[in-house]
Structures are given as structure tokens and as C-alpha cells.
Amino acid sequence: MRPLRYSINVTLDGCCDHREGFVDEDLHRHATENLDQADALLFGRVTYEMMEAAWRPPAPTGARPDWMEPFAQAINAAKKYVVSSTLEQVDWNAELVRGDLGKAVQRLKRESGKGLFVGGVKLPQALTELGLIDEYEFVVHPRVAGHGPTLFAGLSTHLDLKLVSRLEFGSGAVAMRYEPRR
């Protein structure tokens, strides 16, 4: 069974608005390594549309630094599954996921391969409620946003996690990986 991994950038006060983190070469390299651990990505509509707008080729010449190219290539090549009840179709190497979320994700996890990687905020919360995420990574940035959406707001019950690794970056960000205590 393929593991389902979740990684998100978050500030010290729990804000998970992508505009509040900061990006550097080390963090992008780490994100690319995360993508390389998965056969496919799982997005909700909002995250899919945001990532497609940011990363789908062609990027205008000089639009981003050269060190972002490995991530751009990895995300463009990746198979994507998009959970949406409103989109009629997707492309960018993507397939719509409809119907019962738990059953659909269990089916994807049963397929052979390296793993699945989920991004965003709302979809991972729903998957957490269903007990389907096998690994959580929080990349905590040394910033207090003071506003914005927070991670797991409204989760119906607490989630106990066990730290399995920690990685510090020169920027002061820390990537902490956890597995659920079951």
C-alpha cells in the first residue's frame, strides 16, 4: 500500500497562507525531494488551480530563478488527482476524483508505487478526519503572521503524532516529520 504524505509550510503562529512563508533554494530543494518520494499528487480544487497557475509551463523567461526549475519539472511531470465536485474537467496530467472521498483515497493508496503526496489545507483536514494520512511534515518558518488561515482549524478531535525526523534550514525554518500515533 502506498503511503499518503502531507507537507505544508506554516508560520510560528500556525498560519498556513502560502504567501506568509518565504522561499529559498534549500526549501525548494527539500520540496523537490518530497515530490520525488511520490508517484502522484492529490489536490483539492483550490490548491490544484493555485499550483497550475504558478507552475504549469511555459514560464516566461526569467520569471523564476534557475534553482526553482527542478521543482517545476517535478510538479509538471507528476500525475495529479484533483478532488472536486465543481470542476468539470482537468488537464495538466490530472484526473478528477469524485464520490466518496475515503473510498477513493483508499483505492489510490492500494495501488502499487512509492506514495501519494497531498497538499493544501481543506483536503488534508478531511483526510486527517478519515485517518488516511500516514505522515505529516510541517515546515515551520520563523515568522509570526498574525492573521490568515490556520492549520486544522475545526478538527473534530485531537491528533496525536510521533516525531520521526527533524531538519533545520539556514533560513531558520525547521521541517518536522510526524507519524500518527495509532
Regions flagged by a language model, labelled:
Residues 1-132, 142-182:
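Portal/gating segments that form or line small-molecule/metal binding sites
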